[in-house]
Swiss-Prot record:
This is Protein reprimo B. May be involved in the regulation of p53-dependent G2 arrest of the cell cycle. The keyword Cell division does not apply. Keywords: Cytoplasm, Membrane, Transmembrane, Transmembrane helix. PANTHER family: PROTEIN REPRIMO (PTHR28649:SF2), PROTEIN REPRIMO-RELATED (PTHR28649). The chain crosses the membrane at residues 50-70. InterPro entries: Reprimo_fam (IPR043383). It comes from Danio rerio. It is a single-pass membrane protein. One of its GO terms (cellular component) is cytoplasm.
């Protein structure tokens, strides 16, 4: 077994860690770090507000759709009932009784 192969891979591993240690993520963050957090909170708040507004509009659309659909079905059912009911005219005897009771 050749020990130089192991030494080469070990040195390659350590060279990568030394490369990563020089370039840490803290250089990407802005000066105070709070500015990016405030902007992130603001964008999250705006996104949540927009989501709530969209859900309210969709809920109102569904509620009014069900309401108007129900009203339309009620009107149609009343029309069908009136169509099925035969037209009954009161007889003259009923009028005489009503007039006579006063």
């Amino acid at each position: 077994m050749n020990s130089t192969g192991f030494n080469d891979t070990d040195s390659a591993l350590f060279s990568n860690t030394s490369f990563l240690s020089c370039c840490n993520v803290s250089s990407v963050v802005t000066d105070s770090g709070f500015v990016s957090a405030a902007l992130d909170e603001r964008s999250v708040f705006i996104m949540r507000t927009v989501q709530i507004a969209v859900m309210c509009v969709l809920a109102l659309t569904v509620v009014f759709g069900i309401f108007f659909l129900g009203c339309n079905l009620l009107i149609k059912s009343e029309g069908m009932i009136n169509f099925l009911v035969t037209d009954r005219r009161p007889s003259k005897d009923v009028e005489a009784v009503i007039v006579g009771s006063y």
